[in-house]
């Protein structure tokens, strides 16, 4: 008997503290765009308005929603897709045991119950990409939805997609996903990588990681599974994912040939693309820029080729002494992509894996080829983003952004960090967030998170949380630096709450309310401490913000200007400081 994955097997939580799920009505009937509304307490009887923030958590944080993983999420986009009249349902390819990396299907594998659904594809001669619609002046329902999430006009969304500066990854076979956009003129997005390996993790664990990542703010997830049950794991994830799902198809193709890179063929790879497109994968990382002539250049590197996909294709090219079949068949790949609206994430197979290799000839040679491939994809109206490094010291980061915008004609940049130093295993979420904040400021559209386990092991759900929060910090810092019109509102609200000692509001407005309250309560756990005008750092006598309040009160009571009050107030505080023994902490 086939097993299943149930909600009881994984940890699903309701809304974050002090928050509730709200929905904004869209322009068409039934369109409801989710937001997270953070409540605030009053200040001396004066109301502080609730703060609405972008929400990626899907229905899992809606108390009215009953989670049934075996049924998958509701599919609001399904009717939008059918209404356009350019798709057809068909039988699809037969799912085989080889798709899960086995010769005989295991009775213990929890197969998703709805495997008999028919996939959709474009009708003969049709193109169903969001870029195709945008270039023909059509504002789709997906674009209207995105406009509400981003706080912009639908026409602006359409134009950014039409001109290739943004992508809206939305496979017609993933109608469960809530539409989102990736582009430098929108909020900086964060991707979280999940997926099993040959030695670790189960299907239930990966579904849990997906719901966990989106709860903390992941805008997309990539399933990078390389072990058994790749197809089945992906089916469970996609059917329950409220965000776009990306993959690296070469990983599964390699499993189909028993892990022997030289046995890969275009036919096996093509079959894998169609398999994943029928399931609903929204974007593919394709390492079509790893050309035969670039491989020898990497020989003088400190760390060679560090991309898994890049190394697989390099091994194939060298064994056969032929050009990369992903490059030679690129037009055919475009034909597949536009039948399902799968977006390209053109892989950086030659990205630097160490500071010593940053911005070298191999890296930028591949980037030139990615620019060439971008033009070909756009000729087919297929959406494209470009993957970037990697390991890059701070002073070399800006050059990466400038070259990508120039060579790839403004296509969205999607970077892994970059890591700004190589000496901190166990802390690479920090070394990379430094680079991520910088390159996000310079124009990168989406940041691929790095967890504390980078270079060390497969991340668990706690590592996923740490990685997502770290990268939400980097993305938000980049939004602030770019002057995004609404980015500062949450900062301003939290700063006001901090100055007014509204501790619960401080916790609730933060990116990780649970962690903030946990740290506060380690030293001041009493409920009364949630209203105290100090914390354990400075104590009640030397809290700078309490002193500032005292100065303002002094000015008010003595009818003084603030500057004069500060001078007089500071003299009094100096006297008080001396009288208490000149000790800073008490």
UniProtKB/Swiss-Prot annotation:
Keyword annotations from UniProtKB, A to Z: 4Fe-4S, Iron, Iron-sulfur, Lyase, Metal-binding, S-adenosyl-L-methionine, Thiamine biosynthesis, Zinc
GO cellular component, one term: cytosol
Binding locations of Zn(2+): 391, 455
Cofactor binding note from Swiss-Prot or TrEMBL: Binds 1 [4Fe-4S] cluster per subunit. The cluster is coordinated with 3 cysteines and an exchangeable S-adenosyl-L-methionine.
Residues that coordinate or bind [4Fe-4S] cluster: 535, 538, 543
Enzyme Commission number, as recorded: 4.1.99.17
Bias (Basic and acidic residues): 22-39
Cofactor(s) this protein cannot do without: [4Fe-4S] cluster
Name this protein carries in UniProt: Phosphomethylpyrimidine synthase
Lineage: Bacteria, Bacillati, Bacillota, Bacilli, Bacillales
């Amino acid at each position: 008997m086939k097993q299943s994955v149930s909600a009881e097997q994984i940890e699903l939580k309701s809304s974050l503290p002090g928050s509730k799920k709200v929905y904004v009505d869209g322009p068409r009937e039934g369109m409801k765009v989710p937001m997270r509304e953070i409540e605030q307490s009053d200040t001396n009887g004066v109301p502080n308005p609730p703060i609405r923030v972008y929400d990626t958590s899907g229905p899992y944080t809606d108390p009215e929603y009953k989670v049934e993983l075996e049924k998958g999420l509701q599919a609001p986009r399904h009717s939008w897709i059918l209404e356009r009249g350019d798709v057809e349902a068909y039988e699809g390819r037969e799912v085989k045991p080889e798709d899960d990396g086995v010769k005989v299907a295991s009775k213990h594998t929890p197969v998703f119950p709805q495997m008999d659904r028919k996939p959709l594809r474009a009708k003969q001669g049709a193109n169903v990409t969001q870029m195709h619609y945008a270039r023909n002046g059509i504002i789709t329902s997906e674009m209207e939805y995105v406009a509400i999430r981003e706080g912009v006009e639908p026409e602006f969304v359409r134009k950014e997609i039409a001109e290739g500066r943004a992508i809206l990854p939305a496979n017609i076979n993933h109608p469960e996903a809530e539409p989102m956009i990736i582009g430098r003129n929108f909020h900086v997005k964060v991707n979280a990588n999940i997926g099993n390996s040959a030695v670790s993790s189960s299907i239930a664990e990966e579904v849990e990681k997906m719901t966990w990542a989106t709860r903390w703010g992941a805008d997309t997830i990539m399933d990078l599974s390389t072990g058994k049950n790749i197809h089945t794991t992906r089916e469970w994830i996609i059917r329950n994912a409220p965000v776009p799902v990306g993959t690296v198809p070469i990983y599964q193709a390699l499993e189909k040939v028993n892990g022997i890179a030289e046995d890969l063929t275009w036919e096996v790879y093509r079959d894998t693309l169609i398999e994943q497109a029928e399931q609903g994968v929204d974007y593919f990382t394709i390492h079509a820029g790893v050309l035969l002539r670039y491989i020898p250049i990497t020989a003088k590197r400190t760390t060679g080729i560090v991309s898994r996909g890049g190394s697989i294709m390099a091994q194939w090219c060298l064994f056969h002494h032929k050009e990369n079949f992903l490059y030679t068949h690129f037009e055919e790949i475009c034909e597949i992509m536009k039948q399902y609206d799968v977006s390209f994430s053109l892989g950086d197979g030659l990205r630097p894996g160490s500071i010593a290799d940053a911005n070298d000839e191999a890296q930028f040679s591949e980037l030139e080829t990615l620019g060439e491939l971008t033009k070909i994809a756009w000729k087919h109206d297929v959406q494209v983003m470009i993957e970037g490094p990697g390991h890059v010291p701070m002073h070399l980061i800006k050059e990466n952004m400038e070259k990508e915008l120039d060579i790839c004609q403004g296509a969205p940049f999607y970077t892994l960090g970059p890591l700004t130093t190589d000496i901190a295993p166990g802390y690479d979420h920090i070394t990379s967030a430094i680079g991520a904040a910088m390159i996000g400021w310079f124009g990168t559209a989406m940041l691929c998170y790095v967890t504390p386990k980078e270079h060390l092991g497969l991340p668990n759900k706690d590592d996923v949380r740490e990685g997502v929060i770290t990268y939400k910090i980097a993305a938000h810092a980049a939004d602030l630096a770019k002057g995004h019109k609404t980015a500062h509102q949450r900062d301003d609200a939290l700063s006001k709450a901090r100055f007014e000692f509204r501790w619960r509001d401080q916790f609730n407005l933060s990116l990780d309310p649970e962690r903030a309250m946990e740290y506060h309560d380690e030293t001041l756990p009493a409920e009364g401490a949630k209203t105290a005008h100090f914390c354990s750092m400075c104590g009640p006598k030397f809290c700078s913000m309490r002193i500032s309040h005292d100065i303002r009160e002094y000015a008010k009571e003595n009818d003084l200007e603030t500057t004069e009050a500060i001078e007089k107030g500071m003299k009094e505080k100096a006297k008080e400081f001396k009288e208490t023994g000149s000790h800073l902490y008490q």
